[in-house]
């Protein structure tokens, strides 16, 4: 029997792309791998192959049992795994809240929150943890307000999301889904009461979903709960990691912050380069081939599982020359950090707004920001769908 390697984790490599993924992309771009939950799959690491899988042609996220893995099927994961028209219909219910125009209208509020959190950081005095004071609370409060949850609940919502994104042989943490699902159910009742008293159906995302369920019958209550949780988790953890790891990237390239202060037009490209180069999602959604497909010459048969690595694809030298280098002037930069095709990240515009706001404000307010500990002593969270810095002590 051929040897099957374990999936390499960026958490074991100081948040950087594991060297094994670089090697596989160059030498064995479609290879067998054992995932953290024990399943084996084809690991796809080249840009064009990853883009092909993400396009959806010949692949599906909707896995039949037992291919879906331990405790990963059923109602909780239904909205994550949908494909085709059902997926587009559910996505359409909330897409208006995430358009570039709608998100741009949130700019003053995101700036206000960022300023307030940096005030708290400065009051704490150096050394202070940028994760605890800024990177964690900002996306949590923003997504809570967008969804229609009390901002004061952001800490416990973050803890639930941390549990539901853990991966391993036990599969999905069903108790976390149940607890969070009960919370969403209670909040949905509050939104229903608001609607009965003349509230606007588009007041927030959860109210929109309650209206679509009650008045239009466009989704089941289980789908309402599941979709709410998926949006919440997606808006919390990935942006938290991108903020903290993005600040670390800038501090690790000391010439770049001064460059960005001198030329603010480079801020947008710098955000895109951080998104390209920094691993944020450890494990992308696993898919299954629905027909025989060749990827980089390797035959993937119908029914076989495929695990893509967007992180490896975003370093592909065929698309990104000198891909390991951090280059804020890189153009073009067609990274896949937000996915591709029908499942392109719904919250991409929101994530970009938060990242641009945080980085620009830090650059102006804390020009002398630096790490308060050696970079090699920083701890990264493993065993989750998303990567994450546990803390980022900084001084100024």
Report each predicted region and the residues it spans:
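Cytochrome P450
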Residues: 1-396
């Amino acid at each position: 029997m051929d040897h099957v390697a374990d999936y390499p984790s960026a958490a074991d490599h100081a948040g950087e792309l594991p060297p094994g993924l670089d090697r596989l992309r160059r030498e064995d771009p479609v290879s067998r791998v054992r995932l953290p939950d024990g399943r084996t799959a084809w690991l796809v690491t080249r840009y064009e192959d990853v883009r092909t899988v993400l396009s959806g042609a010949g692949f599906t996220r909707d896995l039949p049992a037992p291919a879906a893995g331990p405790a990963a099927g059923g109602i909780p994961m239904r909205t994550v795994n949908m494909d085709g028209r059902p997926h587009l219909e559910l996505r359409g219910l909330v897409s208006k809240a995430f358009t570039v125009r709608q998100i741009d209208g949130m700019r003053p509020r995101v700036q206000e929150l960022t300023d307030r959190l940096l005030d708290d950081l400065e009051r704490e005095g150096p050394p202070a943890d940028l994760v605890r004071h800024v990177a964690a609370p900002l996306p949590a409060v923003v997504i809570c307000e967008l969804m229609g949850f009390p901002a004061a609940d952001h800490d416990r919502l973050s803890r639930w999301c941390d549990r539901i994104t853990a991966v391993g042989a036990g599969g999905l943490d069903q108790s976390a889904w149940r607890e969070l699902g009960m919370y969403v159910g209670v909040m949905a009742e509050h939104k229903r009461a608001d609607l009965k008293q003349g509230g606007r159906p588009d007041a927030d995302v959860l109210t929109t979903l309650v209206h679509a369920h009650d008045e239009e019958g466009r989704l089941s209550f289980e789908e309402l709960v599941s979709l709410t949780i998926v949006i919440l988790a997606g808006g919390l953890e990935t942006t938290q990691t991108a903020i903290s790891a993005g600040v670390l990237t800038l501090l690790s390239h000391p010439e770049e912050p001064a460059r960005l202060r001198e030329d603010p037009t480079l801020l947008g490209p710098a955000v895109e380069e951080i998104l390209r180069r920094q691993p944020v999602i450890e494990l992308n959604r696993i898919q299954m081939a629905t027909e025989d497909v060749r990827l980089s010459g390797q035959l993937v048969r119908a029914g076989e599982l495929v695990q893509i690595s967007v992180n490896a694809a975003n370093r592909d030298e065929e698309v990104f020359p000198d891909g390991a280098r951090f280059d804020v002037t890189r153009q073009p930069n067609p990274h896949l950090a937000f996915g591709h095709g029908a499942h392109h990240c719904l919250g991409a515009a929101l994530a970009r707004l938060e990242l641009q706001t945080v980085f620009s404000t830090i650059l102006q307010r804390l020009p002398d920001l630096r790490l308060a500990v050696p970079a090699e002593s920083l701890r990264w969270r493993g065993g989750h769908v998303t990567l994450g810095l546990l803390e980022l002590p900084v001084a100024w």
